[in-house]
């Protein structure tokens, strides 16, 4: 068994050693919930990593959106290169759930686009949890949604070992039951092909490696890992475990039992609808369900099979669905990052899902059992979660109640950076004053973040600043993923000096070059100007030793008073620590340097691969098309650095293709 091992030049410092010891002591004393109050720049992720290494327990880290999940995943991946660090988020690029609008008699069919790369990573996550213990899974709230039963998923697994005998036809049939597709021409993930005595399998958890099974009669002689693009052998394997190409694979016996259960519920529901004098709903439900039953009988699956998941897992009505939490071992550890946002999000998921499906059931589009294909209720999540460490700079009421108000503080930054100075100015003529402050900040070589209350004001302010010749951009929810990383990179590199936003300039935005955060209309109490929102926004200036925050307000609200007081308290604690240890605060610009190096190195193709591609125009075109798809997938998956890298590779290859033509 592998143990967790951090590979880093840094050691815990500041508040980190004390926080790590306190959390581990709490875990050892069987505390179910603990609160890690970690401010911006205090090294929350590094602290979590050290807790994982010391406890040596499989870990799930929940974040409230894909951006933060991807950021934590990337950091954990670099800290634990020898261990399994996995990524588990929703695999939909686009998702329109089926719905019915009664007032207009409009039925909206389910429409979705699955991101193959994320689907691959989800399979890698569940596979790692079933195969090993040194696993860290970084997930969004997607982990509370229904997933295939881990028992069936493991039961259906095909175990392959050289020297063992396998009936060829039975093995091929087993692969088909795992929802692998036989394709002797287009060999891609989730497919297998047969060539003479060889069977090639492209596993669901790989994108660039496949397995070749070499037989002599019925005996499996060798298993080789190879590159599906070039055919080059990469390694010889002692064994291989083939898991399902879907998390909803199941043996035929389970399918047959489920069909019986569905038929029984269908008859009861049809009788009920008839008794309610609903002939249209009766006919609709019978037609739709009979079609699904026919598909299940013939193929073992159907469109929307997840709506019948209760029958496949043998659960009763109202019981929680299997989720990623059932794949976790009993001694697993859970971190809930930015818990002040994540916990309310978990609480809200169930009600929204049920309201939509209830309409579908009432109007004969689905059986009542579809209501059991759902996310966990908050109470169920609370029951299933293992020992938990909530992490936030601004803990919410649930976390404080669970921990009895006791928090483990992570306030002192090893870098010595102070919380920013907070200045309160009148909101009257705030734009004119802001322009003066922007000039001062830009002259110092820093960048400016401005947060407004409305989209209209953000757009107008951006246009006004651009008219005044300030290099300004507007970050909003409609900005595509790749554009977002380009905007942030342009801001860091100085192509943009001012970035205007509404609610996107809070958690997870790491801009060390930011010398000023301006909060317009700070005295307008509400969600965007609450104590939590203000503290999070103020934290955006905490990466810069000269960082300042200006709150434009005509009156002192309770939120402003509490946020500024808490910031001052943290600032004083850091100042005392710096004086005691002789630390001079200094801005660290390591991240942008690392990004530049990342692009510089990875934009270059492997020489051997480039030579092969450039000598074959047809193969070059195929590779260009493949890279375009991967770039779009990376962008949708919020893997910004990967998307930029692929874009730069594409430029090189397209230039080469033009020369060859």
From Swiss-Prot:
InterPro entries, per database record: Helicase/UvrB_N, Helicase_ATP-bd, Helicase_C-like, P-loop_NTPase, UVR_dom, UVR_dom_sf, UvrB, UvrB_inter
Domain UVR: 621-656
Gene Ontology process terms (BP): nucleotide-excision repair; SOS response
Subcellular location: Cytoplasm
Any one GO molecular function term: ATP hydrolysis activity
Keywords of this entry: ATP-binding, Cytoplasm, DNA damage, DNA excision, DNA repair, Excision nuclease, Helicase, Hydrolase, Nucleotide-binding, SOS response
Binding positions (ATP): 38-45
Main location, first listed in the record: cytoplasm
Highest rank taxon of the organism: Bacteria
SUPFAM superfamilies in UniProt: C-terminal UvrC-binding domain of UvrB, P-loop containing nucleoside triphosphate hydrolases
Domain Helicase C-terminal: 430-592
PANTHER family given in the database record: UVRABC SYSTEM PROTEIN B
Binding partners and assembly: Forms a heterotetramer with UvrA during the search for lesions. Interacts with UvrC in an incision complex.
Family: Belongs to the UvrB family.
Comment, domains: The beta-hairpin motif is involved in DNA binding.
Protein purpose: The UvrABC repair system catalyzes the recognition and processing of DNA lesions. A damage recognition complex composed of 2 UvrA and 2 UvrB subunits scans DNA for abnormalities. Upon binding of the UvrA(2)B(2) complex to a putative damaged site, the DNA wraps around one UvrB monomer. DNA wrap is dependent on ATP binding by UvrB and probably causes local melting of the DNA helix, facilitating insertion of UvrB beta-hairpin between the DNA strands. Then UvrB probes one DNA strand for the presence of a lesion.
Protein name in the entry: UvrABC system protein B
The gene coding this protein: uvrB
């Amino acid at each position: 068994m592998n143990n967790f091992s951090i590979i880093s030049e840094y050691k815990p410092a500041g508040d980190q050693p004390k926080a790590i010891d306190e959390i581990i002591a709490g875990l050892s004393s069987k505390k179910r919930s603990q609160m890690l109050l970690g401010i911006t720049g205090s090294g929350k992720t590094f602290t979590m990593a050290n807790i994982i290494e010391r406890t040596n327990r499989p870990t799930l880290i929940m974040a409230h959106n894909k951006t933060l999940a991807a950021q934590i995943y990337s950091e954990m991946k670099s800290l634990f290169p020898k261990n399994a660090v996995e990524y588990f988020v929703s695999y939909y690029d686009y998702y329109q759930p089926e719905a019915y609008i009664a007032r207009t008699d409009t039925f909206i069919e389910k429409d979705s686009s699955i991101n193959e790369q994320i689907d691959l990573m989800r399979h890698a996550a569940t596979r790692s949890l079933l195969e090993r213990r040194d696993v860290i899974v970084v997930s969004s709230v997607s982990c509370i949604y229904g997933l295939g039963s881990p028992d069936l998923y493991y039961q259906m697994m095909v175990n392959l070992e050289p020297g063992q005998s396998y009936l060829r036809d039975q093995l091929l049939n087993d692969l088909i039951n795992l929802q692998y597709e036989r394709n002797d021409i287009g060999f891609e993930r989730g497919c297998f092909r047969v060539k003479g005595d060889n069977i090639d399998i492209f596993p669901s958890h790989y994108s660039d490696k496949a397995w070749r099974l070499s037989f002599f009669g019925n005996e499996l002689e060798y298993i080789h890992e190879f590159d599906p693009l070039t055919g080059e052998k990469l390694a010889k394997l002692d064994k291989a475990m083939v898991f399902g190409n879907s998390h909803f694979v199941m043996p035929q016996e389970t399918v047959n039992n489920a069909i019986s259960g569905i038929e029984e519920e269908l008859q009861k529901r049809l009788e009920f609808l008839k008794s309610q004098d609903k002939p249209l709903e009766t006919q609709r439900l019978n037609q739709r369900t009979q079609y699904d039953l026919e598909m299940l009988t013939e193929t073992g699956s159907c469109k929307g099979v997840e709506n019948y998941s209760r029958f496949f897992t043998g659960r009763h009505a109202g019981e929680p669905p299997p989720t990623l939490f059932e794949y976790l071992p009993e001694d697993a550890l859970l971190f809930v990052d930015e818990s002040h946002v994540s916990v309310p999000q978990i609480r809200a998921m169930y009600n929204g899902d049920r309201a939509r499906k209830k309409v579908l059931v009432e109007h004969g589009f689905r059986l009542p059992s579809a209501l059991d294909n759902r996310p966990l209720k908050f109470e169920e999540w609370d029951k299933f979660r293992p020992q938990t460490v909530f992490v936030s700079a601004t803990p919410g009421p649930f976390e404080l109640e669970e921990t009895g108000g006791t928090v483990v503080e992570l306030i002192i930054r090893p870098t010595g950076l102070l919380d920013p100075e907070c200045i309160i100015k009148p909101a009257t003529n705030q734009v004119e004053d802001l322009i003066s402050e922007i000039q001062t900040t830009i002259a110092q070589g820093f960048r400016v973040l401005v947060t407004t209350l409305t989209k209209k004001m953000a757009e107008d302010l951006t246009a006004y600043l651009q008219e005044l010749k300030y290099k300004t951009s507007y970050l909003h929810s409609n900005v595509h993923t790749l554009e977002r990383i380009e905007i942030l990179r342009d801001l860091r590199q100085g192509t943009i000096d001012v970035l205007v936003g509404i609610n996107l300039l809070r958690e997870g935005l790491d801009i060390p070059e930011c010398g000023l955060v301006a909060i317009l209309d700070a005295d307008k109490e509400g969600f965007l100007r609450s104590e939590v929102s203000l503290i999070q926004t103020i934290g955006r200036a905490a990466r810069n030793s000269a960082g300042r925050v200006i709150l434009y307000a005509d009156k002192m609200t309770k939120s402003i008073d509490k946020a500024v007081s808490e910031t001052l308290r943290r600032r004083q604690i850091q100042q005392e620590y710096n004086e005691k240890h002789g630390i001079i605060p200094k801005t660290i610009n390591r991240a942008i340097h690392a990004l530049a190096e990342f692009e510089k190195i990875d934009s270059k193709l492997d020489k051997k691969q480039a030579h092969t591609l450039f000598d074959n125009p047809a193969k070059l075109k195929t590779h260009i098309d493949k890279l375009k798809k991967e770039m779009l997938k990376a962008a949708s998956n919020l893997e910004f650095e990967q998307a930029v890298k692929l874009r730069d590779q594409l430029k090189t290859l397209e230039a080469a293709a033009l020369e060859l033509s």
